[in-house]
């Protein structure tokens, strides 16, 4: 996921970043092992996304490195929270349609929780990974959470396509991208005409 953020300009990677975690989550392994994988994924992502903190020239090297590590360690627990909530709902054997709506909603909720209070980190918002795609990022102007929702939905659809080998999921994946791009084009056209 970290590579999908600027300055790398690989925003499309955000559409797939959860897929390995979904495979791990659905394996027959202990919850504690799943938590470790989610934590490592979060830590790695934040280590890449916030690399600039360690390079902060406005402070000493020690403070910059400690701040950098603290960010990576602390915010990775939100990925653990996501894993725990998935585990809770996974025991309920929800339908595919409910999962398609609930899992993105959970991610959006967690990102919103992360952005509250003095430790808020809006620069970690996954919507920022789409800044290189003018048409796709426009949905943020309607509501920032829609972009997050669509990113997680794309991950779920592609995961379901790979794991279940049903074409309806890849068609849905492509449709979500096209609809998002169409909405973006309409918003850009409306902005340019005013």
Language-model segments: which ranges?
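Membrane-embedded alpha-helical bundles of multi-pass enzymes
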Residues: 1-194
């Amino acid at each position: 996921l970290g590579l999908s953020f600027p300055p790398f300009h690989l925003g499309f990677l955000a559409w797939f970043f959860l897929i390995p975690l979904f495979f791990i989550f659905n394996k027959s392994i202990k919850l504690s092992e799943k938590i470790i994988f989610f934590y490592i994924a979060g830590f790695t992502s934040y280590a890449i996304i916030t690399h600039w903190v360690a390079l902060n020239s406005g402070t000493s090297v020690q403070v910059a490195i400690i701040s950098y590590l603290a960010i990576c360690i602390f915010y990775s627990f939100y990925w653990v929270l996501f894993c725990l909530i998935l585990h809770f709902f996974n025991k309920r054997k929800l339908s595919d349609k409910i999962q398609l709506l609930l899992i993105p909603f959970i991610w959006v909720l967690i990102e919103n929780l992360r952005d509250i209070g003095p430790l808020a980190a809006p620069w970690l918002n996954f919507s920022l990974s789409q800044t290189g795609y003018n048409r796709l990022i426009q949905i943020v102007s309607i509501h920032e959470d829609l972009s997050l929702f669509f990113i997680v939905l794309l991950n779920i659809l592609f995961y379901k396509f790979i794991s279940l080998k049903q074409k309806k999921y890849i068609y849905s994946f492509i449709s979500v991208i096209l609809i998002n791009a169409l909405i973006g084009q309409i918003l850009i056209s409306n902005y340019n005409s005013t």
